[in-house]
Amino acid sequence: MFFILLISLPSAFAVIGDLKCTTSLINDVDTGVPSISSEVVDVTNGLGTFYVLDRVYLNTTLLLNGYYPISGATFRNMALKGTRLLSTLWFKPPFLSPFNDGIFAKVKNSRFSKDGVIYSEFPAITIGSTFVNTSYSIVVEPHTSLINGNLQGLLQISVCQYTMCEYPHTICHPNLGNQRIELWHYDTDVVSCLYRRNFTYDVNADYLYFHFYQEGGTFYAYFTDTGFVTKFLFKLYLGTVLSHYYVMPLTCNSALSLEYWVTPLTTRQFLLAFDQDGVLYHAVDCASDFMSEIMCKTSSITPPTGVYELNGYTVQPVATVYRRIPDLPNCDIEAWLNSKTVSSPLNWERKIFSNCNFNMGRLMSFIQADSFGCNNIDASRLYGMCFGSITIDKFAIPNSRKVDLQVGKSGYLQSFNYKIDTAVSSCQLYYSLPAANVSVTHYNPSSWNRRYGFNNQSFGSRGLHDAVYSQQCFNTPNTYCPCRTSQCIGGAGTGTCPVGTTVRKCFAAVTKATKCTCWCQPDPSTYKGVNAWTCPQSKVSIQPGQHCPGLGLVEDDCSGNPCTCKPQAFIGWSSETCLQNGRCNIFANFILNDVNSGTTCSTDLQQGNTIITTDVCVNYDLYGITGQGILIEVNATYYNSWQNLLYDSSGNLYGFRDYLSNRTFLIRSCYSGRVSAVFHANSSEPALMFRNLKCSHVFNNTILRQIQLVNYFDSYLGCVVNAYNNTASAVSTCDLTVGSGYCVDYVTALRSRRSFTTGYRFTNFEPFAANLVNDSIEPVGGLYEIQIPSEFTIGNLEEFIQTRSPKVTIDCATFVCGDYAACRQQLAEYGSFCENINAILTEVNELLDTTQLQVANSLMNGVTLSTKIKDGINFNVDDINFSPVLGCLGSECNRASTRSAIEDLLFDKVKLSDVGFVQAYNNCTGGAEIRDLICVQSYNGIKVLPPLLSENQISGYTLAATAASLFPPWTAAAGVPFYLNVQYRINGLGVTMDVLSQNQKLIASAFNNALDAIQEGFDATNSALVKIQAVVNANAEALNNLLQQLSNRFGAISASLQEILSRLDALEAKAQIDRLINGRLTALNAYVSQQLSDSTLVKFSAAQAIEKVNECVKSQSSRINFCGNGNHIISLVQNAPYGLYFIHFSYVPTKYVTAKVSPGLCIAGDIGISPKSGYFINVNNSWMFTGSSYYYPEPITQNNVVVMSTCAVNYTKAPDLMLNTSTPNLPDFKEELYQWFKNQSSVAPDLSLDYINVTFLDLQDEMNRLQEAIKVLNQSYINLKDIGTYEYYVKWPWYVWLLIGLAGVAMLVLLFFICCCTGCGTSCFKKCGGCCDDYTGHQEFVIKTSHDD
């Protein structure tokens, strides 16, 4: 059994090691916890930073993300000093601490002088996971040695698979005295190491600094003994996560003051400043305070003056509210898991635990777990969580079927016995019990199987640890009965079916007898649908929470009253032991219902109920639901007696009822908002503005970053911190405007005079100064200069406004998939996406129709349209040639081509068989056909001639035979040659046939001998194959057992690799289709979004067109630059493609007059007047009125003024709206990716080869028999009589040869004409060496021939 240690469980780390190297001088004295330093991490001088991989940066500042300590964090002193005794509490938490991302250590170099030598001592540190010899531990241990009277310090670094002692410790230099021996690991064999190396350090340094962190399975180490910034030491890929670190106690007789200050590392952004020599001289933790964030925003240690929008802040909780229902009983899950009986997979058992408490650490300590992993939830979160209830299913695991239980896998267990629901939050526990403490129960849960005789005895004689599982499941209708009717002839015995069921059917066989036959032939597992009947036993797969509905049933084994089936009638099940190494393997599936909501809670991290703090931001844990919020007490009557939690429509916690006091509360989120930092370059810190938030809310809660608070006050913009309130005054220039007419002014003199302020003051910003005119009539609100137009010209502006657009409809399925069926089938899984797309486009088209109707209504009355402008462009496509795309078209494309060939140019050939006389006959005639009868051959005393005649011979013999028949008996002698010729040639045919017959007998005899030898060879081969088969079958059985062992560990192996590949190909194809669908749906979605945006723009432009029709075309607009450029005169409108075309005429100013104007005048100190549609202007120290559109001074009269009741001016400032340009703060990508791969458990493979039977084959006898058969075959050589092949040429007639001769002469004449009479002119006959001129001189050609013998 390969045991997997669950490092995620807190109880797994009771001590650092598990090997008891020593038990002497060990006690349980509590010496306290590690002390906390009064010094904090100050990163400004580089403390906690490092030179990244020793890279050099010159005279620059860099923003780097990495693992750094938090600025302002404290240290813990992890050093432990002993003399003789060690405390067991030293080797447990908090001294054994989580490593997480990494640690930064500040180690004091404790120097002790003895005998004139100054010794250097400090403790060793180890970093690892389980600290056993199956995992690597990193050890950094100091050692000193005296060389020539000088002390040399070494850092011995090793990364090895140490077996760590339970109480590890180191000792000081032997010269300082020791009462213990150094003992921190114990390994009898050679230790496997990845890294070993020694580094020197300065023994005179006051402090040493270490920087250890891990990232992506790689460990990084940095170190320095000079300065604060650490330098690269080494890095090493481990591939595992280091979980803990431990500073080993140092024992020494001498009085040493040890300090090993450690602070954790986390992912931070730092601003690092380097000088011209590449030395890091300043560092900033960007998230430590507001000033640091300003530096990082500007990438400068000395940021310039400005107003900076920071990343904001979140009010931090000031208290914790914890609620659990008290006095709940213990769930006692471990007792049920350790029960004396456990079910088989076929009849797996379930139990629900609710309204009780459980302890995961206690549970794991009571069972021997092989592995524990969770699906859709982090396993470590189970400690301290609450659930509505926990449902646990368990059963014994057959040894060969454990692989079936992997989440998402298939196989017998998950297909036909127990299906794991991957959609819910669940955890899978694999554990084992001793064989003596457990037995496996067998029970068939199928009601219809048990109705027809299946009981526990039907499983036969099974061992106490044999687990029964189904290999196929079958379901039947309620009316099913397997017994036949008595009217059937043949088959099994009759039976009486229960009431309400249907007896087995019969059908008329070929013999016309009523014969009984099974519905499912030959059995339901192999039934393929024969005859006209349908097998009522239908194969099914189970779903989560279902048992197998029934095993298969062979109906011919059922009979009796009532109908009962024999045990062997039930098929499709198997059994196998659950024992392995003397323990029974058991599977338990924890189904977690209503995660973080309920009264079934883990007590591992449970706390006591606290007081409910209201109206401030708090951390809450309410019956397992955790979060942050502000609790507001309300009087709610809508909770029922069994309800404690209230949710909103989005599924978020909205309120709760306290179980103890019955009080009800609403939950509001803690404030998270915008912060503006106002910074002046001459100041060392900024003033802050918490937008839209009162100071009482800011300081009643704890904000994210601590502030050196000087003063604060509420303003129109929000809470202002560290600035002086000076809103009674105003400034005309401001470098730090904050909006809404306010300014934060920095006054250096103010800070030097008033030490309680920061030099910032919050005041009004008025960038203008009113220059009042001394007059008996006083202007109201000041006197200002503006320009008023005095001369004009007529201008024209042509404007097009779109009021409609083409309608768009999309066939979504065709757009995405075309006509690809697989794509369309998978597209259906996307639900109503396509319907939604078309619905949106329909809404867009309806919106366009409505908009067009509104535009048309505005044009119906009072507007004359000009001739409609032609919309659209004619595009002629008739001349486009598509043949390059479509290829060749028409009947000419497939016409077959013809060719000529010269076959047997000179003669026609006829071949015939020759037994020896044809060649001699041919040699005798020499080609003279008249010598035919003279050259008669003799073959074994018989006169013979070849059975072949030429045309001339046929003519001659025919003429002779004809002459002999014309004038008998005078011409009878002329027929003698003919008759001899026929007889001799018949003899030739007979001789040839006789030779062929003799050869045929020889072939048959030799073939019979060969068959005997072949048969003997086959017998020998068969005997050898029988032996081979026996050995191969034995090894196949062994291999089958091995494959079963492998399948337990490596995954379900299909019947063939081709099936696996086909499934993988199908999955890959489906994944690729899904990617393509997603891509095309994204494009379609973007297009539809663009259509929505465009339709909105069209709607707005159409509304603008309607407004311009009403105001510009139907009337004269008083608005400047609305109907054209300038003051409107007249507008015309024309219809245009997809819109309206406007022509505006207006008069445009060409010259302006600068005038002094006032918004009003105050007469007699209490009566005010203001201009009506114009301005009051001061002309030559007298007040007059002029219109706003053109300069034309006229006296102030009652027609151009409005009388006011007072001269006072009410000032109102509109609030400013500023866009939040901060980037969303997304979670770390690595952390988010980690959520998908956490808590993955593995099962070690069992690669035992005990089942393989290695057998050697002895096939010598069979090989000898085969050799004898080969000899017989070799002796079956057939010596056939030679039958030659004679070729007889049939010559062509004389006129054919004449034509060939004439054609040759013509060709020679043509060649002479071409070569000698053309091409080179008349001079060709003058050349001796060739027919063509050679201007480079005569060249001789030497032709050499060679003959190969």
From Swiss-Prot:
Summarize the PTM comment.
Answer: Specific enzymatic cleavages in vivo yield mature proteins. The precursor is processed into S1 and S2 by host cell furin or another cellular protease to yield the mature S1 and S2 proteins. Additionally, a second cleavage leads to the release of a fusion peptide after viral attachment to host cell receptor.
Assigned keywords, A-Z = Coiled coil, Disulfide bond, Fusion of virus membrane with host endosomal membrane, Fusion of virus membrane with host membrane, Glycoprotein, Host cell membrane, Host membrane, Host-virus interaction, Lipoprotein, Membrane, Palmitate, Signal, Transmembrane, Transmembrane helix, Viral attachment to host cell, Viral envelope protein, Viral penetration into host cytoplasm, Virion, Virulence, Virus entry into host cell
Coiled-coil region: 1029-1073, 1255-1283
Name the segments for region: Fusion peptide 2. Answer: 919-939
Membrane spanning segments where?
A: 1294-1314
List, alphabetically, the PROSITE patterns matched.
BCOV_S1_CTD, BCOV_S1_NTD, COV_S2_HR1, COV_S2_HR2
State which ranges are Extracellular (membrane side): 14-1293
Which stretches of sequence are listed as region Heptad repeat 2? 1244-1282
Q: What is known of its domains?
A: Fusion peptide 1 (FP1) and fusion peptide 2 (FP2) function cooperatively and have a membrane-ordering effect on lipid headgroups and shallow hydrophobic regions of target bilayers. They are considered as two domains of an extended, bipartite FP. The membrane-ordering activity is calcium-dependent and also dependent on correct folding, which is maintained by an internal disulfide bond in FP2.
Similarity comment: Belongs to the betacoronaviruses spike protein family.
Subunit structure, interactors included: Homotrimer; each monomer consists of a S1 and a S2 subunit. The resulting peplomers protrude from the virus surface as spikes.
Give the protein's recorded name. Answer: Spike glycoprotein
Q: What is the lineage of its organism?
A: Viruses, Riboviria, Orthornavirae, Pisuviricota, Pisoniviricetes
